[in-house]
């Protein structure tokens, strides 16, 4: 029988100083975790107050510890600070959405979009096209329902050559970020139009933030200090479960 002193075991993948003991006294109960998940709501109204850098870094710390396929840790972050800078992304989002829905006005355009998106994707966008154009019109008239006059936008990006799980990795990081934001007193909302507008708007948003051409935006969160606090959370649909 061998007896080793404490800390004698080492691993080439984990150099000294890269493994931290778990602080069990900080671990929440199941009920506490579930209450955080239940009470997290999308926030769409933000105070005119910037989010401090140290607070943003706490959100990113939670995001970077999200699980990832093969533990590749592929997700990278672009932090857009300040209402003016976020508004510029909103303007590019509006242009990208307009460019995407424009073909649906014409038969030949609808045919081309079916070839690009597939029938189901094109039908879905065609159904939403009037609403999306309405959001663009509102934005151009001064009512921002795209990025909600938020003081902060975080883009979750990765090298697209990594495969389809780059999107999964990024959105696992998004979920961690939303929960951390909630715990820090921030409000957040998933900004799906930003990715859609970038994909179908010629990649203008990616170019605007100097994203490498090999990379893609897989997730986007607008964030800030909320103007309103919800005191209750609504029920969700029951889980559809098949037990095997």
Language-model features, listed with the residues they occupy:
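Acidic, surface-exposed loops and disordered segments
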Residues: 1-244
């Amino acid at each position: 029988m061998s007896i080793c002193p404490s800390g004698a075991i080492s691993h080439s993948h984990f150099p000294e100083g890269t493994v931290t003991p778990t602080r069990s006294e900080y671990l929440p109960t199941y009920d506490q975790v579930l209450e955080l998940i239940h009470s997290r709501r999308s926030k769409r109204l933000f105070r005119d107050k910037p989010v401090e850098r140290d607070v943003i870094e706490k959100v990113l710390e939670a995001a970077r510890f999200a699980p990832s396929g093969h533990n590749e840790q592929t997700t990278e972050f672009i932090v857009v600070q300040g209402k003016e800078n976020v508004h510029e992304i909103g303007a590019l989002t509006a242009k990208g959405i307009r460019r995407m829905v424009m073909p649906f006005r014409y038969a030949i355009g609808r045919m081309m979009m079916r070839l690009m998106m597939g029938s189901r994707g094109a039908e879905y966008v065609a159904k939403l096209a009037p609403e999306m154009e309405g959001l663009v019109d509102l934005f151009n008239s001064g009512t921002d329902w795209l990025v909600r006059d938020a003081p902060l936008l975080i883009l979750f990006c990765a090298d697209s050559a990594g495969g389809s799980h780059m999107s999964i990795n990024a959105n696992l990081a998004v979920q961690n970020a939303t929960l951390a934001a909630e715990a820090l007193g921030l409000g957040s909302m998933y900004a799906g139009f930003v990715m859609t507008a970038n994909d179908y708007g010629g990649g203008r948003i990616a170019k605007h933030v100097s994203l490498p051409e090999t990379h893609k935006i897989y997730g986007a969160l607008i964030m800030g200090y909320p103007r309103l606090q919800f005191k209750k959370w609504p029920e969700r649909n029951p889980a559809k479960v098949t037990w095997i």
